[in-house]
């Protein structure tokens, strides 16, 4: 579950905060 959660959360974070780039 974490393995899928991690990338999913990261992708969402980039879309919501592209400046972060993280």
From Swiss-Prot:
It comes from the Eukaryota. This is Unknown protein 20 from 2D-PAGE.
């Amino acid at each position: 579950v974490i393995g899928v959660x991690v990338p999913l959360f990261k992708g969402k974070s980039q879309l919501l905060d592209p400046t972060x780039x993280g």
